[in-house]
Structures are given as C-alpha cells and as structure tokens.
Amino acid sequence: MDYDMTTNHIKSLIDNNCLDEAIHLLSHRIETNKEDDEAYYLMGNVYRKQGNIKMAMFYYTSATEINAHSPAAEAYRVLLDIRNFINPDYNP
C-alpha cells in the first residue's frame, strides 16, 4: 500500500472511530520511520479523540519537534487552551 493510500486509510479509520486499528497502523509507521511527523500528528488525533489529552499532547509535541510547521503545533495550542480553561490551576 502506498504512503498516500495508507494515510487516507488511517484518517478514515480515525473518522470512523476505529481507533485501535489506527493506533496499530500508526505504531508500525512510527517504528519504521521515526521522522514521520504526520504519523505522530495522527496518533495525537487518535488520543485526543479518546479523551487522552496527555498522550495527545505528547504526540503533537513529538510531531512539532520533527516539523515545526506541522498542523500538530496548532492542535497542541488548542488543547493547551482547553486544558487551561477547564483547569485554571494549570495556568497560575
């Protein structure tokens, strides 16, 4: 399966809440290419969709460390704003 088809398939899995399968495919993709910022971004989306904000932020950070222009940078900022709004203790 080529890269674009795999990416589209993973996005479809995420959209359809087939999150375990998406995690499996993304984990394999990250194992085979540690510099795949898109895979880290998509993994962050999976964890965000599961409500695991801590892991989502971890993967978004990983993506932006590889590519500062990744959409993960904006996703991270949005999650940070939400976290600070919900729990003002994080924002002294």
Give, region by region, the residue ranges found by the protein language model.
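Short coil turns that delineate tetratricopeptide repeat
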Residues: 34, 67-68
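Canonical tetratricopeptide repeat
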Residues: 42, 75-76
